[in-house]
Amino acid sequence: MKIGPVGKHDARSTTIVNWDEGSHDGFISQIFLSHGVAGIMSIQFQFVMDGKLVLSDRHGPFSGNMFDVIELNYPHEYITGISGEYYKYEANNPHMRSLKFNTNTSEYGPFGTSGSSNDKFAFKLGKSPQFGGFHGTYDASGLQYIGVYLRPKTVLPKIDTGNAEETESKIVLG
């Protein structure tokens, strides 16, 4: 299930690049972010697929005066949400201003910058490992849009009916 993307781009930009990391049947083990005072410049991922580490393409220019590596404790830690801010007006810099990643055990970020001219977003993906990947766009000035894939649960949880029957048998009428 494709959710988003959120963000905005400069209509004057002629170099918009779409990217999609949702086709991987693996888990993200690391996220690489290049950012600065203008916002998120680039994002890149490392996946675990078939027992091997696979590095995605970098999405955005490798610039910005800050670089962060988010290391997830694979296979015990997984993404449960992403939130952030994007600039709502046209500008000649990245519109994705800040990103924060939530997992089942930790919170990473926010990375980038915050401001009153920004719109906020949040994708909350539940407590179980349903995250399926990222997608978005970038141009020469940085990350413009970002969205996520959700893999809904495909197995029903087992319901313990033993306790329910026991509880019902203790009810006394009259």
Swiss-Prot record:
Expressed at low levels exclusively in phloem-associated cells (e.g. sieve elements and adjacent cells). InterPro entries: Jacalin-like_lectin_dom, Jacalin-like_lectin_dom_plant, Jacalin-like_lectin_dom_sf. Induction: Regulated by the transcription factors NAC045 and NAC086. Disruption phenotype: Susceptible to systemic infection by tobacco etch virus (TEV). The keyword Chloroplast does not apply. CDD domains: Jacalin. GO terms for cellular component: cytoplasm. Changing residue 139 to N: In rtm1-1; susceptible to systemic infection by tobacco etch virus (TEV). It is found in: Cytoplasm. Residues 1-152 form the Jacalin-type lectin domain. Keywords: Cytoplasm, Lectin, Plant defense. It comes from the Eukaryota. The keyword Nucleus does not apply. Gene3D superfamilies: Jacalin-like lectin domain. GO terms for biological process: defense response to virus; response to virus; transport of virus in host, tissue to tissue. It holds the Pfam family Jacalin. One of its GO terms (molecular function) is carbohydrate binding. Self-interacts. Interacts with RTM3. Belongs to the jacalin lectin family. This is Protein RESTRICTED TEV MOVEMENT 1. The gene is RTM1.
